[in-house]
């Protein structure tokens, strides 16, 4: 059963080949049998999920119409609210916080009869690219348990890679869907800013955050977006970008002009560079034309991103003070000490580092030097993308400079920040991008290529990703690191 895509599972439900209860129980069995080695989940919603599965089976038995996601098990990153379920953001600060309402994406998924399996691990408050900054436990890469799955949506990518669920929700602030998708050999889609509601997402960087799906195939990205994309009155930043459905758009003619910022590829590991050019060759064989585009301003993207993201994080996380929200220290002599001790005990080192950086760049003495100049460079970066899209339909770039790194290779914070060089610009410019598996490194680890489009061109970007997937014949990669995960046992 794990070999079926989300679409195939839904077809099996519609054709009465499988019950929703049987599907749900099967995936819980996989999680309970193997997740101890991987650590993708923080909590499970088993009783709730089986109850919903039973109700959907009853609807089927009565001949009632069923939703777009009927019978599809879905994992949810633990910064997205599900009513009555803990939302911890993988932080001691929110260890006991129970969500009082559903996020819009969760509400729309359940309206379409999707089954929510549980909450997935992440870097604390979505700050990180290794899922080693979770306060509770690390998540391991199913391809090599000594390597990181990427982050911050590492639990989401690992869960899909291990086939614990065919769809998982992640959030992408600077590459947090695309990078772990590439590291774990799955598809990851970062929608345009405003394409998917952020209502019920715990904010990290409010002008950068976007919820999106991770899946095994591009068709399931389209299915998920059809279920939950679109305007939401509870999120004033959302817009109605799309005509028709994502699923229908996959069959349309693929754009022919693909831009590549060749001057921006020098930092790639050699086999990653070879793989990227092989991916371009696939698109050329199918009739696309590759042209050079000038995106030299991207060299400023990482510092600008960490100025803007840290400033927004410091502002958003100010509410977690032990009074309004979050952990409160057991003892303090005065209010100031209570604030300080509660935040020191509640936040991990990486979150603390970014809050300090954010407060520094927003300080009266430094705001003009850092934050305002950073926003000016952000505007230049947006202009550079717009100029590039006047010459091409889509931009292709690598997702990462290397395959997934080992634990012992986790570098100092600044070096880790620099690894975001191929992903953060997309968020700064509000653009959509899809990461699609593009093959394996010399060490047998998955690699990914990303296709980037203009804001609102999400359907076109999924279409390009689907075309690459079909013509590269790189589809449904199965990791080998966990014994019994794909050989033997129930199927």
From Swiss-Prot:
InterPro entries associated with the record: Amidase (IPR000120), Amidase_CS (IPR020556), Amidase_dom (IPR023631), AS_sf (IPR036928), GatA (IPR004412)
Entry keyword annotation includes Ligase: yes
Active-site residues (renumbered): 77, 152, 176
One Pfam family it belongs to: Amidase
Superkingdom of this protein's organism: Bacteria
A Gene Ontology term for the protein's cellular component: glutamyl-tRNA(Gln) amidotransferase complex
TM segment ranges: none
The entry's keywords: ATP-binding, Ligase, Nucleotide-binding, Protein biosynthesis
Disulfide bonds: none
Gene Ontology biological-process entries: translation
Catalyzed reactions per annotation: L-glutamyl-tRNA(Gln) + L-glutamine + ATP + H2O = L-glutaminyl-tRNA(Gln) + L-glutamate + ADP + phosphate + H(+)
Keyword Flavoprotein listed: no
Family assignment from sequence similarity: Belongs to the amidase family. GatA subfamily.
Function text: Allows the formation of correctly charged Gln-tRNA(Gln) through the transamidation of misacylated Glu-tRNA(Gln) in organisms which lack glutaminyl-tRNA synthetase. The reaction takes place in the presence of glutamine and ATP through an activated gamma-phospho-Glu-tRNA(Gln).
NCBIfam families: gatA
Subunit structure: Heterotrimer of A, B and C subunits.
Protein name: Glutamyl-tRNA(Gln) amidotransferase subunit A
Organism of this sequence: Chlamydia trachomatis serovar L2 (strain ATCC VR-902B / DSM 19102 / 434/Bu)
Lineage of origin: Bacteria, Pseudomonadati, Chlamydiota, Chlamydiia, Chlamydiales
Gene name linked to the record: gatA
């Amino acid at each position: 059963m794990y070999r079926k895509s989300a679409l195939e599972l839904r077809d099996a439900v519609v054709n009465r080949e499988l019950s929703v209860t049987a599907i749900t129980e099967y995936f819980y069995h996989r999680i309970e049998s193997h997740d101890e080695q991987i650590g993708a989940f923080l909590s499970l919603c088993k009783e709730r999920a089986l109850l919903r599965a039973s109700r959907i089976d009853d609807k089927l038995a009565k001949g009632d119409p069923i939703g777009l996601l009927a019978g599809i098990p879905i994992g949810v990153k633990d910064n997205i609210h599900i009513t009555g379920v803990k939302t911890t953001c993988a932080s001691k600060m929110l260890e006991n916080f129970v969500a009082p309402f559903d996020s819009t994406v969760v509400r729309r998924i359940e309206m379409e009869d999707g089954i929510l399996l549980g909450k997935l691990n992440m870097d604390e408050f979505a700050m990180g690219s290794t899922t080693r900054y979770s306060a509770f436990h690390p998540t391991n890469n199913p391809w090599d348990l000594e390597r990181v799955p990427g982050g911050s949506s590492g639990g989401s990518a690992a869960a899909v890679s291990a086939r614990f669920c065919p769809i998982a929700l992640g959030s992408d602030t600077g590459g947090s869907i695309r990078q772990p998708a590439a590291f774990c050999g799955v598809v990851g889609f970062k929608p345009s800013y405003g394409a998917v509601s952020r209502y019920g997402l715990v904010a990290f960087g409010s002008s950068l955050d976007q919820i999106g799906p991770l899946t095994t195939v591009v068709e399931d990205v389209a299915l998920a977006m059809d279920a939950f994309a679109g305007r939401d009155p509870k999120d004033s930043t959302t817009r109605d970008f799309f005509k028709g459905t994502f699923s229908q758009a996959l069959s349309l003619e693929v754009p022919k002009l693909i831009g590549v910022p060749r001057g921006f590829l020098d930092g790639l590991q050699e086999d990653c560079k070879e793989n990227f050019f092989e991916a371009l060759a696939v698109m050329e064989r199918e009739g696309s034309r590759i042209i050079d585009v000038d995106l030299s301003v991207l060299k400023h993207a990482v510092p600008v991103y960490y100025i803007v993201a840290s400033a927004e994080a410091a502002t958003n996380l100010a509410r977690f003070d032990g009074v309004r929200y979050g952990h409160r220290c057991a003892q303090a002599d005065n209010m100031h000490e209570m604030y300080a001790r509660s935040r020191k005990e509640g936040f991990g080192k990486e979150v603390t580092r970014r809050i300090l950086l954010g407060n520094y760049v927003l300080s009266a003495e430094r705001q003009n030097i850092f934050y305002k100049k950073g926003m000016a460079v952000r505007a230049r970066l947006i202009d550079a993308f717009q100029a590039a899209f006047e010459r091409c339909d889509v931009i292709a770039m690598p997702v990462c400079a290397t395959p997934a790194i080992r634990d012992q290779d986790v570098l100092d914070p600044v070096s880790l920040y620099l690894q975001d060089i191929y992903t953060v610009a997309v968020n700064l410019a509000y653009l959509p991008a899809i990461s699609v598996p593009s093959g394996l490194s010399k060490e047998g680890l998955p690699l990914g290529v990303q296709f980037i489009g203009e804001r609102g061109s999400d359907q076109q970007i999924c279409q390009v990703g689907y075309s690459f997937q079909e013509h590269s014949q790189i589809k449904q990669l199965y990791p080998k690191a966990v014994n019994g995960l794909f050989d033997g046992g129930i199927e």
